[in-house]
A protein has these predicted regions:
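A short helix->loop->beta-strand "cap" motif at the edges of active sites that frequently abuts
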Residues: 23-25, 215-219, 302
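Short internal beta-strands
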Residues: 28-32, 218-225, 261-266
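Electropositive, gly/pro-rich neighborhoods at or near active sites that engage anionic ligands
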Residues: 32-166
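Short, flexible loop segments at boundaries between secondary-structure elements
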Residues: 34-35, 215-232, 309-311
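Active-site glycine-rich loop that binds ribose-phosphate moieties when present
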Residues: 162-182
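Charged helix-capping and loop-helix junction motifs
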Residues: 201-209
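C-terminal functional extensions of proteins
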Residues: 232-272, 300-336
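Short, basic, low-complexity termini and linkers enriched in Ser/Thr/Gly/Pro
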Residues: 270-285, 289-301, 333-336
Length: 336
């Protein structure tokens, strides 16, 4: 079984690639819910929805979120009625949130609601929220404390962040199936999502990080940082706020106690080779990797590999997914 940890838009691209090459019953996707919010009285799970829409081939290719060819008549009317409208929901997208909210109010858990939505969309891949308990990502900024969506969407992540809080994380429990999936996995993949606000909430759920430390399967992360900057979104700025560099070394630090292999973009090969104190020279596009001494890493030295990680097409997604799984199948030390 292949287990993927992901946030929303960026990570869901790799999920689509894995979907092309892995049997659906052998793929489990564990998704961040720290971004969840109540909007117009509805429970919205942005990252789960991005994953579901991606797997169902419904995701808007132009926007990178929401449903393809959606209309926004309800949003227009809500704006006319004086309701908040900075968080855009399309009409078809609203149907998902209405359905989820109805199931939650009827007593179903978020896991159960997610499974039912996946079935209705014809998705056979197992999609799990990180927890059925509410965990909220809150950010202390120069303008006050904000929810993640207020920071990311309303403020366009342009305000300075001084601290990140994961409200409710300490009392949360992994959703049913999460720990079991980690224990049974043949490969564990961290998609190129924000290490602070996408992966951070997942890893803050008690029991998940410990399970990753104990995992017998190789743990591979695809870096969301290319050329010292985030491919999209505020990952770089948030990593610096955490005291991590906005580099491959910063990504490795975020996952240092369980990570075995870090996949970087080929654009970073030259920079890596010139900074041997951080990461040793590696061959672009080659599964034969050198090793980087990351303090307190799970293994004696982290294996770092370069390939193309920018996913613009279905072929790019498939190629990266194949590359990652081939790495997992390469025996430790085989590249020596």
């Amino acid at each position: 079984m292949i287990v993927v940890f992901t946030g929303g838009t960026g990570g869901s691209k790799l999920v689509q690639g894995l979907q092309q090459i892995v049997k659906p019953e052998e793929l489990t996707v564990i998704v961040n819910t720290g971004d969840d919010l109540e909007w117009w009285g509805l429970h919205v799970s942005p990252d789960i929805d991005s994953v579901l829409y991606s797997l169902a081939d419904l995701l808007s290719k132009d926007r990178g979120w929401g449903v393809e060819d959606d209309s926004f008549r309800c949003l227009e009317r809500m704006t006319q009625l004086g309701q908040p409208s900075w968080f855009s929901l399309g009409d078809l997208d609203l149907a998902t949130h209405l359905s989820r909210t109805a199931m939650l109010r009827a007593g179903k858990t978020l896991s159960e609601a997610t499974t039912e939505l996946a079935e209705k969309f014809g998705i056979r891949v197992r999609v799990l929220p990180m927890s059925d308990d509410r965990v909220s990502t809150l950010l202390d900024t120069a303008t006050g404390r904000l929810t993640f969506q207020e920071y990311f969407v309303r403020e366009r992540h342009q305000v300075e962040v001084r601290a990140v809080h994961l409200e409710g994380a300490e009392h949360s429990r992994p959703a049913p199936g999460v720990i079991e999936s980690i224990e049974r996995a043949e490969a564990i993949v961290f998609a190129p999502s924000n290490p602070v606000t996408s992966m951070g909430p997942i890893l803050a759920v008690p029991g998940i990080r410990d399970a990753l430390r104990r995992a017998t399967a190789p743990v591979v992360a695809v870096s969301p940082i290319v050329g010292g900057a985030a491919v999209s979104g505020p990952a770089g700025a948030l990593m610096k706020m955490m005291g991590w560099p906005s580099t491959l070394a910063g990504v490795a630090t975020a996952y240092k106690d369980f990570l075995d292999i870090l996949v970087a973009d080929g654009a970073d090969a030259q920079a890596i080779s010139s900074q041997q104190s951080a990461v040793s020279p590696i061959a672009s596009g080659d599964a034969s990797a050198s090793r980087s001494p990351i303090p307190d890493s799970r293994s004696a030295a982290l294996r770092v590999v370069c390939t193309n990680t920018i996913m613009r097409s279905a072929a790019d997604k498939r190629d990266l997914a194949e590359f990652v799984l081939n790495l997992c199948a390469t025996p430790q030390g085989a590249e020596a």
